[in-house]
From Swiss-Prot:
Taxonomic placement: Eukaryota, Viridiplantae, Streptophyta, Embryophyta, Tracheophyta
Phenotype reported upon loss of the gene: Pigment deficiency and seedling lethality.
Record membrane topology: Multi-pass membrane protein
Oligomeric and partner information: Interacts with ALB3.
Main location, first listed in the record: plastid
Organism this protein belongs to: Arabidopsis thaliana
Gene: TERC
Entry protein name: Thylakoid membrane protein TERC, chloroplastic
Length: 384
């Protein structure tokens, strides 16, 4: 018989709740050694009271049993309802966690954009301050050469970013590793361009006819930009990609941000290293256009080097800002083609003695690039 029936019939005082707390005294484990002949618990119960309780318990109706059954039914129903509640709680938890993760991702992306914007603004501000300093020390002519070279290099660097986006998409580089690839690519670009500028300066000082060769390169690049159709996102037939894949044994998957990993006991390169190699070779190919273009504006190696350096330093942060919206700058590439064609014609005219001032060159470069950007933004707003 359950304890509830005993309480109901008055043997024990009724409790205010379903939980009964009994205080059991603690007896020493060596009670027999102390001379006690009976169990300590038997000493607590009055024999007459125990027999009376047994007689009354034998005549009680099975009320407590029915109450126990009701309790079991209620517990069973609660157990049956519990999975549904758990499912609802799990669904709510999943939805709330997805919302939280989405909000966290948006917050992190916003913070990344803010940091990149500040970095780009700092690089541009530093370049402007440097150009003003050159103007104060060397005159307006040198400052115009620097700004013309800087704007030209910056626009060509933005054009390079179109190819970087295609390379990252082709090799499926995770977003968290793209900055590492760009860092190595920019470091290699600085070293290569510095070497190329020194060699180009020495060559132009000895061989004036090299100007015609550089002008031909710029005119050919301008023609290619005008004649090229929509960017092909499939780089499987690209010469640089095929060359790197031929000479660099690469695994089929990434291994974190590592450039090398062991595959079947053999040390192989990961696709991340292959991506860096393609980025480096692509920048070398672009430098063949950009370096002659700056030499078409100025022959001062210091101006050529510093304008390149300032244009490249903020390239990684600039990529973060405009990588998602590059498709919207559809008129930027034709405007760059106009600039390259103009610089090529200018170099040919300079070779034959017809000089175009640096200020005029700066105006043509700035006007062409700004027109391309404004046309792209206008076309975007009209489509939306």
């Amino acid at each position: 018989m359950s304890l509830a029936s005993v309480i109901h019939h008055g043997i024990l005082p009724p409790a205010k709740s379903d939980r009964i707390f009994l205080t059991i005294p603690v007896f020493p484990p060596d009670f027999r050694a102390r001379g006690w002949t009976k169990s300590p618990f038997s000493l607590l119960i009055n024999p007459s009271l125990a027999s009376a309780a047994n007689r009354r318990l034998s005549h009680l109706p099975p009320i407590a049993c029915s109450r126990g059954i009701d309790q079991e039914d209620e517990e069973k129903e609660s157990r049956e309802l519990l999975p549904h509640k758990n499912d609802e709680n799990a669904t709510t938890s999943r939805s709330s966690s997805s919302v939280d993760s989405g909000g966290l991702k948006d917050y992190q992306q916003e913070e990344t954009y803010k940091t990149s914007f500040k970095t780009v603004a700092l690089c541009v501000g530093t370049a402007v301050a440097f150009g003003i300093g050159i103007g104060l020390k060397e005159g307006v002519g040198k400052a115009s050469e620097f700004f013309a070279g800087y704007i030209l290099e910056q626009s060509l660097s933005v054009d390079n970013l179109f190819v970087f986006v295609l390379v990252f998409k082709y090799f499926k580089v995770p977003l968290m590793y793209q900055n590492k690839v760009l860092t190595y690519g920019i470091a290699g670009a600085i070293v290569f361009r510095f070497t190329l500028i020194l060699l180009g300066t020495a060559t132009l000082q000895k061989f004036e006819a090299v100007n015609l060769l550089l002008a031909a390169v710029l005119l050919y690049s301008s023609f290619k930009l005008f004649a090229s159709e929509e960017d092909d996102t499939d780089l499987s037939d690209n010469f640089i990609v095929k060359t790197c894949q031929r000479f660099i044994p690469v695994t089929s998957s990434y291994d974190g941000n590592r450039f090398f990993t062991k595959h079947d006991g053999i040390l192989k390169a990961t696709p991340l290293l292959l991506t860096v190699a393609v980025i480096e070779l692509s920048d070398i190919a672009f430098a063949v256009d950009s370096i002659p273009a700056v030499f078409g504006v100025t022959r001062d190696p210091f101006i050529v080097l510093t304008s390149n350096l300032f244009a490249i330093l903020g390239l990684r942060s600039l990529y973060t800002l405009i990588s998602e919206g590059m498709d919207e700058l559809e008129y930027l590439q034709p405007s760059i083609a106009v600039v390259l064609g103009f610089i090529g014609v200018k170099m040919i005219l300079d070779f034959f003695g017809f000089h175009i001032s640096t200020e005029a060159s700066l105006g043509v470069v700035a006007l062409s690039l700004s027109t391309g950007v404004l046309l792209s933004l206008t076309n975007k707003s009209s489509d939306s």
